[in-house]
């Protein structure tokens, strides 16, 4: 699937060249494993790295609505399959390579299915444990996301 050209919608903020950018990073959990995706080569930031389902907080929608939309758009899991959403403690992730500070909102999303349909933003996915995730090339800061959600992930 080819990357669509980004055009901000009315009310949407373009953080592409901004110094600070608020983002969600969702860890999708099904039973005793969680989903990580390998980012597409066509993404502006961190192509090829493994990460949760992430997106800019770039409009005025509520957080739960934004989370459900990202999950549906990026991995094809509808809102009806989301069991719980839990928010972790927000943190800043400095990234000199992109001259950006990410304001990361860690989110745990428990789902009732492991059926995934990727969109263009990811080229691969795996359902993994903590130990399996550590062996992959993780997006900078994703280890902190996992740490801040660890008490819920390991249940």
What is each stretch, according to the model?
Residues 76-77, 138:
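Helix N-cap/coil-helix junction residues
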Residues 1-25:
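Acidic, metal-coordinating catalytic segment for phosphate/diphosphate chemistry
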Residues 28-29, 36, 109, 127:
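Conserved hydrophobic "DFG−1" position in protein kinase catalytic cores
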Residues 30-32, 89-115:
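Active-site-adjacent beta-strand/loop module that shapes the phosphate/pyrophosphate-binding cleft
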Residues 78-88:
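A short coil-to-beta-strand element that immediately follows conserved catalytic motifs
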Residues 33-73:
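Conserved Nudix-box catalytic region and its N-terminal flanking loop in Nudix hydrolases
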Residues 106, 117-148:
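NUDIX/MutT-family hydrolases
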């Amino acid at each position: 699937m080819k990357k669509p050209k980004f055009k901000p919608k009315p009310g949407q903020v373009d953080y592409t060249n901004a110094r600070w950018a608020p983002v969600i990073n969702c860890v999708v959990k099904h039973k005793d494993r969680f989903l990580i995706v390998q980012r597409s080569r066509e993404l502006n930031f961190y192509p090829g790295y493994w990460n949760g389902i992430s997106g800019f907080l770039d409009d005025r929608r509520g957080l739960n609505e934004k989370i459900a939309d990202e999950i549906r758009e990026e991995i094809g899991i509808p809102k009806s399959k989301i069991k719980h959403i839990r928010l972790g403690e927000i943190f800043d992730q400095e990234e000199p390579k992109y001259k950006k500070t990410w304001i990361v909102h860690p989110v745990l999303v428990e789902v009732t299915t492991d059926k995934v349909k990727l969109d263009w933003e990811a080229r691969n996915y795996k359902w993994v444990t903590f130990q399996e995730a550590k062996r992959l090339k993780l997006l900078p800061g994703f280890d902190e996301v996992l740490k801040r959600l660890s008490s819920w992930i390991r249940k």
